[in-house]
């Protein structure tokens, strides 16, 4: 199916709906205009009481003389008439064109307003300026019909010409009732339509999916960078929507469902939008949480309504973001099989591949928790194809940066390949944030273009947080932080299998970091060896060991370091088989492969004995203790470098990789320290200053 056809179909649907609404409102306006016209006609019609009409008929027996319009003259009467909702004293005369109907008497009269004469107020005379002729009047008759006979006899006796009114037609007889009923029906329809609209309190069972046309999306595969493999996987879906006959003549069928899995921020939603933009078909977008409601059965009703809307516009795409909110494994909830979420999931399973499933609807979904999804949802026939949208490699990051810097004025010295190299592990959202941070920093510094310095500072802001220059520490705490970070940097520089140190700083950043040591990998890594994990543990422990060597006590600042080191050691024992317990896995994990913290997946220890658990704890303690001894030995040998680096940090607060290398090379007693190759008798520097441990510990 071509792109033009999809857009035209959706535009026609919208145009028909708009025309129907316009016609409805025009009809509603016509009814209101008719009622207003009837009200205006009645307002300008003079009402005459029955008794006044009898008096006027009796007075009309005499010869009327308009030159003698005085009180008591024949042919007229003085009455109080209600005209235009105002009660006035009027003189009524010249009764004519009388029409006698079953419920009312109509005709024409002449009216002239009376004005008081003198100050007593008992004399009135007509005001010729207010004379109105041919005024329509109406006198209502009683339902019993006796008044009609009496007034007809009086009119005949007065020789006043009259005629009987024609019998009222069905419309005239029931016009007010019909108009009132139409108005009430129109009001009820509008109220029900408003209540049933999305977002209203009564729209329980209606789907909250939003329909997008191709021109509203404006996104194609050219806007998607860094995930070329994922794009190639989904191109077949677009090709099928454009020309399905190519696949059908070979007996093939398009996947009914495509599941996009990957870490947050990698572009899963963007890829789905690009598919809809390329295919040119209607695109329904909604979140998994849109099906969840406090009322029982609402989620299943919304699923059915969503597919009904989609089938009416097939071929089309339904995109469900955050599918894990809807499709978690059944039976895991507290409420068991009667859980509302499970009813919603069952409805989705039936709609995707049941007796009444529609092949013209393609379901796409995105999640970063595929391990929590129900197996029935992932089987072939529902989500046939699983597309991994993983973190981009260095080439992918460079392509993503090229997309985001299109509207950014860059300095000629900016090398996007270098920026991609210093951002391993960054996803598309991180890189977009990095470019924006660099542009903001350049604007804050009144620069005309964004340079490499802004990108480097942006990387630090994204990874370590914002600098807290107003957070002032006392000299004792600042010195302790300097030794702590110097210990990290020195051990990371000395050990093999560690990432190069890019920067050491004692400027507080983020929420709780009083200092940081930034290491940048030289490339993308997918595996870690046992020696690399041990080196990482030693780097984490170096800060607190440096504090202990210099100050003979430790502070609370190493809390996060100890937590991370212990976690690595425990995983080495329980998951990776890197301990004396052998190549055995002791943990059943439901951790997410795409979330940095593992998500909230449940982890439990396999059925092992108490003795094995005790041995695991002993192995964790052994790995930590051996790492502490190695770190202590390195820092004892490199104490001169530790003190020199600390003094430099106290002066400038930040040391980059080049200056770090210079300081360590100048104060090193020999080649780089490698565990197991240290000289037996290594002399310490005799020029080291003596530092007294402060009494105040660093917190946080």
From Swiss-Prot:
The active site is at 485. Residues 42-171 are periplasmic. It comes from Pirellula staleyi (strain ATCC 27377 / DSM 6068 / ICPB 4128). Zn(2+) binds at residues 484, 488, 561. ATP binds at residues 262-269. It is a multi-pass membrane protein. Its main location: membrane. Homohexamer. Binds 1 zinc ion per subunit. One of its GO terms (biological process) is protein catabolic process. Its cofactor is Zn(2+). This is ATP-dependent zinc metalloprotease FtsH. Gene3D superfamilies: 1.10.8.60, P-loop containing nucleotide triphosphate hydrolases, Peptidase M41. Keywords: ATP-binding, Cell inner membrane, Cell membrane, Hydrolase, Membrane, Metal-binding, Metalloprotease, Nucleotide-binding, Protease, Transmembrane, Transmembrane helix, Zinc. The chain crosses the membrane at residues 21-41, 172-192. PROSITE patterns: AAA. Its EC number is 3.4.24.-. Pfam families: AAA, AAA_lid_3, Peptidase_M41. In the central section; belongs to the AAA ATPase family. In the C-terminal section; belongs to the peptidase M41 family. Residues 1-20, 193-700 are cytoplasmic.
């Amino acid at each position: 199916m071509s792109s033009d056809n999809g857009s035209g179909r959706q535009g026609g649907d919208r145009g028909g709906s708009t025309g129907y609404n316009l016609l409805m409102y025009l009809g509603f306006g016509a009814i209101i205009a008719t009622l207003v016209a009837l009200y205006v006609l009645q307002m300008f019609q003079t009402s005459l009481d029955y008794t006044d009409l009898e008096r006027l008929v009796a007075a009309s027996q005499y010869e009327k003389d308009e030159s003698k319009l005085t009180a008591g003259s024949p042919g007229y009467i003085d009455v109080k008439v209600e005209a235009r909702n105002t009660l006035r004293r009027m003189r009524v005369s010249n009764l004519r064109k009388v029409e006698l109907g079953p419920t009312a008497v109509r005709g024409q009269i002449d009216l002239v307003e009376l004005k008081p004469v003198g100050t007593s107020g008992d004399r009135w005379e007509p005001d010729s300026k207010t004379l109105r002729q041919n005024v329509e009047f109406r006198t209502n008759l009683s339902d019993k019909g006796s008044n009609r006979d009496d007034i007809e006899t009086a009119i005949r006796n007065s020789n006043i010409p009259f005629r009987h009114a024609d019998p009222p037609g069905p419309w005239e007889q029931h016009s007010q009732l019909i108009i009132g009923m139409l108005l009430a029906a129109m009001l009820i329809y509008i109220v029900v339509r408003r209540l049933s609209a999305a977002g209203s309190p009564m729209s329980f069972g209606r789907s909250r999916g939003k329909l997008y046309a191709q021109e509203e999306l404006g996104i194609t595969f050219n806007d998607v960078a860094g995930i070329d493999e994922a794009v190639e996987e989904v191109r077949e879906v677009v090709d099928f929507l454009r020309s399905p006959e190519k696949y059908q003549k070979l007996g093939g069928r398009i996947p009914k469902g495509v599941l996009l899995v990957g870490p947050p921020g990698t572009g899963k939603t963007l890829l789905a939008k690009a598919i809809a933009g390329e295919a040119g078909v209607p695109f329904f977008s909604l979140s998994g949480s849109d099906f969840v409601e406090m009322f029982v059965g609402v989620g299943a009703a919304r699923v059915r309504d969503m597919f009904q809307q989609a089938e009416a516009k097939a071929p089309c795409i339904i995109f469900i973001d955050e599918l894990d909110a809807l499709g978690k494994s059944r039976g895991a909830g507290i409420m068991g099989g009667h859980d509302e979420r499970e009813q919603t999931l069952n409805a989705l399973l039936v709609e995707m591949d049941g007796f009444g499933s529609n092949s013209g609807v393609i379901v796409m979904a995105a999640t970063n928790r595929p391990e929590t999804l129900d197996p029935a949802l992932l089987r072939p026939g529902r989500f046939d194809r699983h597309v991994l949208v993983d973190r981009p490699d260095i080439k992918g990051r460079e392509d993503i940066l090229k997309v985001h810097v299109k509207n950014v004025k860059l300095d000629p010295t900016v090398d996007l390949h270098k920026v991609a190299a210093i951002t391993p592990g960054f996803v598309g959202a991180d890189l977009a944030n990095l470019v924006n941070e660099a542009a903001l920093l350049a604007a804050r510094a009144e620069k005309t273009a964004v340079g490499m310095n802004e990108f480097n500072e942006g990387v630090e802001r994204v990874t370590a947080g914002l600098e807290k220059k107003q957070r002032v520490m006392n000299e004792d705490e600042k010195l302790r932080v300097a030794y702590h970070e110097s210990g990290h940097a020195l051990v990371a520089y000395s050990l093999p299998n560690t990432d190069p140190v890019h920067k050491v700083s004692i400027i507080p950043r983020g929420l709780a970091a009083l200092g940081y040591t930034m290491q940048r990998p030289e490339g993308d890594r997918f595996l870690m060896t046992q020696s690399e994990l041990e080196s990482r543990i030693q780097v984490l422990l170096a800060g607190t060991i440096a504090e202990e060597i210099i100050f003979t006590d430790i502070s609370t600042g190493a809390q996060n370091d100890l937590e991370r080191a212990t976690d690595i050691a425990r995983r080495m024992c329980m998951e990776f088989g890197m301990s004396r317990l052998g190549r055995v896995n002791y943990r059943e994990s439901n951790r997410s492969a795409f979330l940095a913290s593992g998500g909230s997946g449940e982890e439990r220890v396999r059925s092992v004995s108490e003795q094995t658990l005790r041995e695991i704890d002993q192995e964790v303690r052994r790995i930590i203790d051996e790492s502490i001894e190695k770190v202590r030995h390195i820092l004892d040998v490199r104490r001169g470098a530790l003190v020199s680096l600390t003094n430099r940090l106290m002066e400038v607060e930040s040391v980059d990789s080049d200056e770090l290398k210079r300081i360590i090379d100048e104060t090193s007693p020999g080649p780089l320290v490698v565990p197991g190759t240290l000289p037996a008798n290594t002399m310490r520097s005799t020029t080291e200053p003596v530092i007294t441990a402060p009494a105040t510990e660093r917190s946080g």
